[in-house]
Amino acid sequence: MGLWLVLANQVGLVGTLVLVVCFTPANSLVRPLLLPGITALVSYGLILNKEAIANAGAWSLVNLNTAGLFLQYLDVGLISRWTYSAYGPTSSRGGQPNASLDLAGRKKPPSSSLLSRLQWGFSTATSWRAPSTVWEAKGTPHFEELPSRGRFLARNAMTLLWSVLVLDVMGLVGGDLDPVANAAHFTWDRVRFLARLGDVSRDEVILRATVVYMRWGAMYFSLQVVYSFLAIVFVMVGLSPVQRWPPLFGSFTEIYTLRNTWGKAWHQLIRQKVSSPAHYTTYSLLGLRKGGIAGRYTCILATFFVSGLLHLFCAEYSYGIQWDQSGTLRFYSIQALGIAMEDAVQATSRRLFAYRSTYWTRAIGYVWVLLWFLWTSPAYFFPLLKYDTEKRPPVLLGPIETWLQSRHVQ
């Protein structure tokens, strides 16, 4: 019964959003009046997800979608104010690309039929990057060449299997979870690094690096599994075309700066959702000047702060981590500081040394990014690891693990 309620909650959120963007004018009072109801549905959904879904990883993903739909409503319903008649956003207050296009420069709705409206509304509610449209989120990767439907399905099936296999291997290499060891190794004191650098042992550095980089790898492949699975289902049954499912991640050759890492290499699924309220707060509420240093970095900080709130509800909330033990907001907020630091270094280098990008500067950049995440990521990961006591059985390598265990016993 609980899972059916979870599904009903998701349908209610998506359905409300679809009806709002399809059938209400941009400035309709219905839109803000529905916000308390959306907030109540999301709050109930976060509680319901935890009670109905046993696997912590699964309910984290469902929580991400639940809280993400709240941000989606804020953006397309209230800030950017999408409508079917405009076939897109009607306001640029959320920093939406091309929102200022007049109606003559926009793609026209194919028809005014109910089915056409609902299809567009469903796409608007669920395609958070708005790929292959003029409203596409900045940094969204593209196909090198648009594949045929069959090739797309085959490629995503291989990606899905490969990603699951890698996660299985990572699970086997990681071994059994030891709650006692986790509680000792991943305390909040261990998050602090530079302040106690003289007391940090080589073994702790190795453990820290192993955990940080493996957790980022696990997040990468976990997101790829979900994305490839949904892409296969939606394209196979005809709910969306191939062009609505471009690659999830960009090129990891771009991770020589933090700005590129977050804006090009990592997924952009929530970029518009978290940047819209940040853009609105910075430039509409605070009235800071666009293009100014204060406005630019306030908006970056606000964007990462909103992203931190989203990840807090989808991850830490799932594990029951107390607020005073939480590091998610700290991790995401400090990324703005890192970007400001590297911007300052690059600007100074350009003025003093005629800086230009070379193989050597990129090599230094890769090291910088790896060290930055080695320093900052434990604030995000260690509280989760401390409370993570769930052994996740391998999906593909389960029989192999069983055979290895039987040989070990013999």
UniProtKB/Swiss-Prot annotation:
The UniProt record lists the keyword Membrane: yes
Keywords: Acyltransferase, Glycoprotein, Membrane, Transferase, Transmembrane, Transmembrane helix
One GO location term (cellular component): membrane
Cysteine-cysteine disulfides: none
Annotated TM spans: 3-23, 28-48, 59-79, 157-177, 219-239, 300-320, 364-384
Compositionally biased tracts (Polar residues): 90-99
Pfam families with a match to the protein in the record: MBOAT_2 (PF13813)
Glycosylated sites: N98
GO MF entry, a single one: O-acyltransferase activity
Domain of life (superkingdom): Eukaryota
GO biological process, one term: lipid metabolic process
Residue span of region Disordered: 90-112
Pathway as given in its UniProt record: Polyketide biosynthesis
Compartments in which it is found: Membrane
Coiled-coil parts of chain: none
PANTHER family in the cross-refs: LONG-CHAIN-ALCOHOL O-FATTY-ACYLTRANSFERASE 3-RELATED, WAX SYNTHASE DOMAIN-CONTAINING PROTEIN-RELATED
Role played: Acetyltransferase; part of the gene cluster that mediates the biosynthesis of aurovertins, fungal polyketides that exhibit potent inhibition of adenosine triphosphate synthase.
Similarity field: Belongs to the wax synthase family.
Protein name: Acetyltransferase aurG
Organism: Calcarisporium arbuscula
Top-level taxonomy: Eukaryota, Fungi, Dikarya, Ascomycota, Pezizomycotina
Gene name of the record: aurG
